[in-house]
Amino acid sequence: MTSPASSTRDRLLDAAIALFARQGYSSTSVADIQQACGLSPGSGALYKHFPSKKALLQEATRRHVEQMDAMRDEYDRTRPSDTTSALRQGAEQIWASIDNNSQLLRVMFREPEALDDMIDELWSAVAANAYQRTARALSAAKDAGVSRVEDPEATSTVLVAALAYLPIVQLLIRRTPGKLDADRFREAWLRLAEGVFTGVPPT
């Protein structure tokens, strides 16, 4: 059973990130966060759970990293054996991770200085969970004589960055590249990625 203290802490985290994403980290006060949680703006209740507004943002960042790690572990447990299905599942998980953490990502892109001392931790998690893992898989495909790519690390970086581009553009400006819907974009990406991994040109 969740304790009242844990419940309040989670409510503060959720309310704060929503406010940071909507009106900006620097424009959000502790009183704003408390009021959004239904607490008295002048009560100082936030300080019972976090020493500062910055500490709250740091905790939200750690929670994001933990969620990415959990999704990585889930992918490892359920990864299909065939390339096409594995790529599809990986793509869906990357998009889900961006969607689930869209509010924190808005803060990161619009006010990077707010996350300045946390960027390395956050980016290391992103790299480990997407770029590096894709590079290892593509290197293995090349070593097995299946993929024909010359530079697995650079190629995998381009693949992951291209995949993440659509949801990030949607997140920031509510538009999509080329005005494509998400399904068409994903299916085109999957055909390209499968061609890279299998050495068979996409149709």
Show which residues each predicted segment covers.
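Helix-turn-helix
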Residues: 19-55, 59
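Short helix-capping/turn signature of helix-turn-helix
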Residues: 50, 109-115
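Amphipathic alpha-helical linker/stalk segments
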Residues: 58-90, 134
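C-terminal peripheral helix-coil segments that are non-catalytic and often amphipathic
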Residues: 92, 96, 136-139, 162, ...
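Amphipathic alpha-helical packing segments from all-alpha helical-bundle domains
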Residues: 96-100, 107, 117-144, 153-157, ...
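N-terminal intrinsically disordered/low-complexity leader segments
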Residues: 1-7, 74-76, 201-203
